[in-house]
Amino acid sequence: GICSEPIVVGPCKAG
């Protein structure tokens, strides 16, 4: 999704 993956890149950060 947009704000649901545990990645530190993109529109959202992990957490």
From Swiss-Prot:
Annotated localization: Secreted; Nematocyst
Source superkingdom: Eukaryota
Record keywords, A-Z: Disulfide bond, Ion channel impairing toxin, Nematocyst, Protease inhibitor, Secreted, Serine protease inhibitor, Toxin
GO MF term (any one): toxin activity
Chief localisation class: secreted
Keyword Nucleotide-binding: no
Residues at the site labelled Reactive bond for trypsin: 13-14
A Gene Ontology cellular-component term: extracellular region
KW Ligase (keyword) present: no
Additional remark text: A synonymy between H.magnifica and R.crispa is controversial.
Function of the molecule: This recombinant serine protease inhibitor inhibits both trypsin (Ki=2.4 nM) and chymotrypsin (Ki=23 nM). It may also inhibit the TRPV1 receptor, a receptor of the pain pathway. In vivo, shows anti-histamine activity, since it dose-dependently weakens the clinical manifestation of the allergic reaction induced by histamine injection. In vivo, does not show toxicity to mice by intraperitoneal injection.
Family: Belongs to the venom Kunitz-type family. Sea anemone type 2 potassium channel toxin subfamily.
Name of the featured protein: PI-stichotoxin-Hcr2k
Organism, as annotated: Radianthus crispa (Leathery sea anemone)
